[in-house]
Amino acid sequence: MLKASYLAGTAFTKSYVGYVHAVAHSLGGRYGIAHGLANAVLLPIVLREYGASVYGKLARLARLTGISSAASDKEAAESFIEHIQKMNDDMKIPGTLQGIRKEDIPTLAAYADHEANPLYPVPVLWNAGELERIYHLVQEEQKRDRTGNQTDFGKAA
């Protein structure tokens, strides 16, 4: 178990999930949203927001896993992120988390910023103000949710 825990920690540290985890922790702490659900909803959003800074590594993953053979790193990376979104859709994981109060967002972002910086290695450094955008995107993803599913505080609708 110790070795498995170490390997999991190493994987998390090297996989750019720092902001995903930090935001998920703040949502779980404030609203009781299930950590796994929050992570699943946040991952494609945060990867999209990282933009070009992660194209090379995500493109490599896309090619290694057979998700994309696109010559362009941008195209391959976008295919990889889209594949994550499709897996979420297939598992009926919503594209949004309802119940996040706008007045809480600055405090939540400050908590996430404090946790993620400098504890997690991330491809792009964001401050609390920039992290607020992620919370707003989590609410706005409903417009792009292909499953029609939503959640209220982490409970299936």
Across the structure, where does each feature detected by a protein language model lie?
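Active-site segments that bind and position negatively charged phosphate/pyrophosphate groups
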Residues: 1-86
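C-terminal charged capping/lid subdomain of soluble metabolic enzymes
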Residues: 58, 68-157
